[in-house]
């Protein structure tokens, strides 16, 4: 009698595990942050078996915050220096980065959505979305600072980088998996899409490429 092997695919285990966490730790090692790496990784990984996918991201942000400086501007400077090389700016929607790089953006969404840090936080998300989409991280800013964030979104829609333009369109989609709803008026969405598409057409015409 043949024994049937049972396999269960786990997206959370594929995306967030010891291997992916090491990529974040390796990057932090290259910054001025001085921290206990083994303790940092153990604290995160010990909790993973009891956490679902989004909860794992939230937990990594919580643990990371305990190792970063209390001063937000210093902390995001470290995170910016830890970011990997930008994604290919010519790639299309099937390329939005490795999920471990959601952590820096979510850190900024949790701790930087304030009057004091609004400008630097949005600037960070523009940079981080070139590594992993910040479409989820931008949403707390849309809810708390709708006017300022929509101005930022419109600027992103005209950016030369595909991934930044993608943030403009995906960040204001009403619904995304695991994300809070984006309360953006339909006419604002259409306006951003029109700006984005116009910019993409200009780039396509200038570069003679289909990847816009």
PLM regions and their residue ranges:
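Surface-facing alpha-helical segments and adjacent helix-coil boundary elements at the starts of domains
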Residues: 1-212
């Amino acid at each position: 009698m043949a024994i049937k092997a049972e396999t269960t695919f786990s997206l959370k285990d594929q995306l967030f595990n010891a291997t992916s966490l090491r990529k974040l730790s390796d990057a932090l090692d290259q910054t001025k942050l001085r921290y206990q790496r083994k303790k940092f990784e153990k604290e995160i990984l010990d909790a993973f078996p009891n956490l679902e996918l989004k909860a794992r991201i939230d937990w990594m942000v919580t643990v990371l915050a305990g190792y970063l400086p209390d001063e937000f501007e210093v902390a995001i400077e470290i995170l910016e220096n830890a970011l990997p090389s930008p994604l290919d700016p010519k790639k299309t929607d099937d390329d939005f980065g490795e999920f471990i790089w959601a952590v820096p953006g979510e850190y900024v969404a949790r701790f930087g959505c304030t009057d004091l840090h609004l400008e630097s936080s949005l600037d960070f998300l523009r940079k981080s979305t070139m590594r992993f989409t910040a479409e989820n991280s931008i949403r707390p800013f849309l809810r708390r600072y709708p006017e300022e964030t929509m101005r930022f979104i419109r600027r992103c829609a005209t950016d030369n980088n595909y991934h930044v333009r993608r943030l403009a369109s995906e960040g204001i989609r009403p619904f995304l998996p695991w994300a809070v709803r984006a309360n953006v008026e339909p006419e604002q969405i259409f306006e951003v899409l029109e700006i984005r598409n116009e910019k993409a057409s200009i780039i396509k015409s200038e570069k003679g490429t289909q990847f816009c």
